[in-house]
Amino acid sequence: MSAILNVEGITKRFGGLQALTKVTFDLPEGQILGLIGPNGAGKTTLFNVLNGIYSPDEGRVHFRGKDVTGHKPYHLSRMGLARTHQIVRPLNGLTVRENVTAGACFGRENQKLGRAVQIADEVLEFIGLAERAEQLASSLNVAQKKRLEMARALASRPYLLLLDEVLAGLNSSEIDGMIAIVRKIRDQGVTIIMIEHVMKAVMNISDRIIVLDYGQQIAEGTPQQVAADTRVIEAYLGDPKLAERLMKEE
């Protein structure tokens, strides 16, 4: 299985703060990679490097075989890399359909408006928001806005999707619904990296997991391997038996 993303020695500093230190990993196509760690561990900073908001101070990022280190977010979107944000900011004065249409217009396939609207309707059906298409984005609740954020990213037709805490603020039934959507996206061939604090979800949906702590990559492996790693237990999970329980829960 070929790698869609190669991350080599990524280091990022903000003045005297070193937010990331030589983070390195390869991501095979078609997998879900979970990215976990305490608050302030560098997870969102890594996303910001991967999608071009920040340029790394050291290291390289290769996406689909091309060096994209320091490329701008709009360029990476055209190449097929999309992301969601932890704090969703829809275009509140536009309808749900118009929000998703914008994603299609500025994505990988550079769609004309008419086709972009068709793509928006297809994605809204897929994501479960078709009946809300004519509503203003401002009228949606938190769970619906999370889905809209994901729909807007999907409309860009990404090869790689970065999901930043899409489960945050959701209740248990909403979490189950969102997990089902993430699996559907993966089943359509989209590779996913997801930052998440809902351990039950990330342990059961991820093919592999990377753990960051103070910007250091302290573990990488299958959920079972990561759950048994003493460094992860000390830095994040706390309870040695917690991970075992999470792995058994579906």
What is each residue range found by the language model?
Residues S2-E250:
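Glycine-rich phosphate-binding loops of nucleotide-dependent enzymes
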